[in-house]
UniProtKB/Swiss-Prot annotation:
Substrate binds at R72, G73, G74, E75, V76, T77, Y78, H79, A148, L149, G150, G162, V163, S164. It comes from Herminiimonas arsenicoxydans. It is found in: Cytoplasm. It is an enzyme of class 2 (transferase). Keywords: Acyltransferase, Cytoplasm, Transferase. GO terms for biological process: protein modification process. Residues 33-216 form the BPL/LPL catalytic domain. Catalyzes the transfer of endogenously produced octanoic acid from octanoyl-acyl-carrier-protein onto the lipoyl domains of lipoate-dependent enzymes. Lipoyl-ACP can also act as a substrate although octanoyl-ACP is likely to be the physiological substrate. It catalyses: octanoyl-[ACP] + L-lysyl-[protein] = N(6)-octanoyl-L-lysyl-[protein] + holo-[ACP] + H(+). This is Octanoyltransferase. It comes from the Bacteria. Pathway: Protein modification; protein lipoylation via endogenous pathway; protein N(6)-(lipoyl)lysine from octanoyl-[acyl-carrier-protein]: step 1/2. GO terms for cellular component: cytoplasm. The record marks K145 as: Lowers pKa of active site Cys.
Amino acid sequence: MSASTSPLIRQRGRESYEITYAAMRAFTDARTAQTADELWIVEHPPVFTLGLAADPTHVLDAHDIPVVQTDRGGEVTYHGPGQVVIYLLLDLRRNHADARIFARELVNKIEQAVIDTLAAYNLACERKAGAPGIYLSDGPLQGAKIAALGLKIRGNGCTYHGVSLNVAMDLTPFSWINPCGYEGLVTIDMQSLGAQTTLTAVQDTLAEKLTRHLSG
């Protein structure tokens, strides 16, 4: 993806997951080879989402939070206020004839964008082989998860779903699930680590980092 075809960035504000999910699918259904790629920035009310591989028993107690089955990869995760969510609506064939091979590179680019975003706030984080997402790389909470990702890549190379980064959340609902299918996985947010920032600032930073890596 060249700089001239950098994705359009759309701020959708706070929106229910079901509305965004339906909109992503409709956008992808309707897109053509000429449709511009887009990044959608959104904040969701509380919701648990299940990936295609999800075991419903990893939702230990949903309380009154909706549980939504999706068509993304991965297991169960939680979205809620104070979390940056960016969905990537891309056509991987535009610059990569074999979209499936590029999919692995895409995951690396997304993860690196998150790592770079956190580094801007002096938070050292890393990826883990075989466990998509971003984790603290040092300190007493080493291994705690701060960002999750899951994608849907259709046979025509078009993607949707994306990445979530915990900024300043009520983390309690993460204890009601086995996050990403891992029992006992600790989940953390930027605020708990001392980062002084706002949701809007992190949205802007992550969108910029994603655009830069996708254009590289």
